[in-house]
């Protein structure tokens, strides 16, 4: 899809500014459209999702590739009471039959588990309860009128008081879907963003088994044999093994960076980047942007990291002479990379040689496992290669066979990040050696 920036949005404000604002750090679709920010049109995702139909759909992409913005867009499209003008001029608006059938027609439950980041299981569970409670409050309209009986209303109140026990918590989202279906007489769409963050944080802090059980029960209840469910979409960075938290979900479809379907719906493709650079008068920066931020291979598409491109354009609007930066590394830690480099150093062998080859722009061949659990990520060098690939530190240059891929560092930014981590750990080792008697 190409970019869309409508004159119909805040014409007076746009007239005062030389260019439409760039949405640096903004992941809310309604805000981007209503406040006149530059938007790269990804509404084709809606059409693909409905045409390829899956009752439960999981999308995995590295961080900062537009997952949260796409989920916000899905909510705005399907939710009852939506402002349909948000989609004026966008790709999906051309499909009038689809818009008439689906736009603004369904109750939507939308939660993000990004905030479930705690040092203990008890605190993580409290955070999860808070997220469910806040989402339930967004649907307080169902308490009006007499569509729900007193028992239904009591069930709803149990979700918004913040006093729910674990039994209530694991059934909370299923309960909310049932109440919404009864009120609206429509099946419910469920959106769960950053589904795997609670598992990642639990693994880091020593309560992984407890969190797996909680998340499995929560998801199983709302996603498996739930007669109130229209369909669900989940996003995350890694595809956790189905046996871990998606046990028994026969209605489950996954889409990863290796799949051809949806390969242009997360991240920017070349034409989108060229159009953005042209609009902001940065055509001469194209080769630099491509060298630094392109190089990812999703399905059959060559993809740029949108976070990098937007930040680069924004910075160079103010100062065209700025050198490129490693924008991606500043968004979170690089724990996966640190684990890998430390393990490669400890191995003193092939892994270290492979790392040197990658930094030098060469290709290595490795088997890739997509179905790891979080407590397996660092268990072996083979698993670490898979983790680096899925997390966006490596991309593929083609298959050798079903599970074996030709891997490479995607771009200069990632090469710099890897080099910086290697040098930092080398410096630590030198300092330790200097302290030894």
Spans of model-derived segments:
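Phosphate-binding site recognition
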Residues: 2-437
């Amino acid at each position: 899809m190409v970019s869309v920036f409508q004159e119909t949005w805040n014409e007076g404000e746009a007239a005062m500014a030389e260019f439409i604002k760039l949405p640096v750090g903004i992941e809310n679709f309604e805000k981007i459209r209503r406040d006149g920010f530059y938007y790269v049109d990804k509404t084709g995702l809606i059409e693909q999702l409905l045409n390829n139909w899956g009752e439960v759909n999981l999308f995995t992409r590295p961080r900062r590739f537009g997952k949260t913005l796409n989920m916000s867009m899905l909510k705005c499209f399907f939710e009852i009471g939506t402002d349909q003008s948000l989609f004026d001029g966008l790709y999906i608006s051309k499909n009038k039959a689809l818009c008439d059938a689906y736009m603004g027609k369904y109750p939507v439950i939308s939660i993000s588990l990004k905030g479930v980041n705690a040092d203990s299981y008890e605190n993580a569970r409290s955070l999860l309860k808070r997220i469910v409670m806040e989402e339930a409050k967004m649907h307080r309209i169902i308490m009006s009128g007499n569509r729900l009986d007193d028992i239904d209303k009591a069930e709803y109140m149990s979700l918004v008081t913040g006093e729910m026990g674990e039994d209530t918590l694991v059934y909370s989202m299923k309960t909310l879907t049932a109440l919404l279906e009864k009120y609206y007489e429509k099946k419910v769409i469920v959106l769960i963003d950053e589904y795997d963050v609670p598992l990642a944080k639990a693994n880091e802090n020593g309560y992984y088994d407890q969190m797996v059980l909680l998340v499995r029960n929560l998801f199983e209840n709302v996603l498996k044999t739930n007669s109130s469910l229209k369909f669900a979409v989940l996003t995350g960075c890694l595809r956790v093994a189905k046996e871990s938290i998606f046990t028994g979900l026969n209605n489950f479809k996954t889409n990863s960076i290796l799949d051809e379907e949806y390969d242009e719906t997360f991240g920017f493709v070349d034409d989108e980047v060229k159009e953005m650079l042209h609009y902001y008068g940065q055509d001469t920066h194209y080769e630099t942007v491509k060298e630094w931020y392109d190089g990812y291979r999703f399905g059959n598409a060559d993809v740029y990291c949108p976070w990098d491109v937007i930040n680069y354009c924004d910075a160079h609007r103010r100062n065209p002479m700025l050198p490129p930066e490693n924008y991606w590394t500043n968004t979170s830690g690089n724990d996966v990379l640190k684990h890998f480099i430390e393990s490669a150093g400890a191995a003193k062998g092939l892994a270290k040689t492979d790392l040197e080859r990658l930094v030098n722009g060469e290709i290595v061949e490795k088997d890739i496992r997509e179905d790891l659990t979080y407590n397996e990520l660092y268990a072996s060098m083979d698993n670490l290669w898979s983790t680096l690939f899925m997390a966006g530190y490596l991309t593929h240059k083609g298959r050798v066979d079903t599970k074996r891929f030709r891997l490479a560092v995607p771009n200069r930014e990632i090469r710099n990040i890897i080099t910086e981590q290697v040098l930092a750990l080398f410096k630590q080792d030198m300092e330790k050696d200097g302290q030894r008697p």
